[in-house]
């Protein structure tokens, strides 16, 4: 059973949008529990939950202010225990997102760290003095736009944030930070989880010398300047691999645990999954790209196993960060429903572990979000060039005849639109009823 994950089908749940039981328009843990039978009927082996921890929700839970508790909008630790119990009773393993490279700026540690330069958490985050002209320490950029450095008036220093300014990066060069992060992993293992999906797994360490990132040789202008730098010094540091080994040692003390790392660069994936002493799997971005072709899929799979001697990939066509693939890869010559079945069959036939995103089993399409409906920070910043991620995060369509499609008895946090009602669990429009189950296809 130690490699159960190699034969598994994983089902990703975005809790905010799965099922609301409290009447606030936001999905919750009880909602997931209420649908475990549905998930079991799909034939999947594990669920992966996007962040459910205490958070101000500036980035929908990826800004964590307490890594050891459940945000009240989702429930509490007691309800989480119930979710683990019911999932395991149905032979479904539970994998949870872990956001470890940074915290929320509302985390007690950061509040203390920014207060002065002498406090106990003074170097738990990445602080640096301004240049002589007052500008940031280097040219590093945030993936969400602008400089990766934010000036703090209390400490009179800049702090690093690879993402939103409300998501300050932890200083992993500090051994106490490493010890604290390992204790978080132990906490959730003791709660009975079966694995972790490590968000931005190659972002933990930064170059101590804070050297400038070089420009990419490709002169093509991107709508987001972040992608015009070679991220040589801001991420992918050698110390990161050493820490992955420390994480693996912790998980190895428990039975049948899997550790999946979110890593965009295929070459880096090979490093992180080699030698059976770091990540168990790399969550690949290569098949989340804009254009669909048999060449893309063939080359991606072949390249992974060519570069990674004994690594193992986790493949997805859709997730909570990219437009749904049925729309992203749309072709007017192919009916959407048929295309959804085709791509599902392809995903489940690839060597590696497939990960289905909620609604993918329905052939769900991307929701068109108007500007005044946008909740996602990058969507607001880069619109209309980039519409953000809300379109793939709209609520699950359970029954097209019920109020709010059976998701909630009040207005949902993101709209459910007519186009998406066509792909509902009830009546039986699910791909589940028109093709073999994911479990059958992957074996």
Question: Model-found features: residue ranges?
Answer:
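Active-site and adjacent substrate-binding regions of carbohydrate-active enzymes
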Residues: 1-435, 439
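N-terminal low-complexity segments that are often proline-rich with Ser/Thr-Pro
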Residues: 441-443
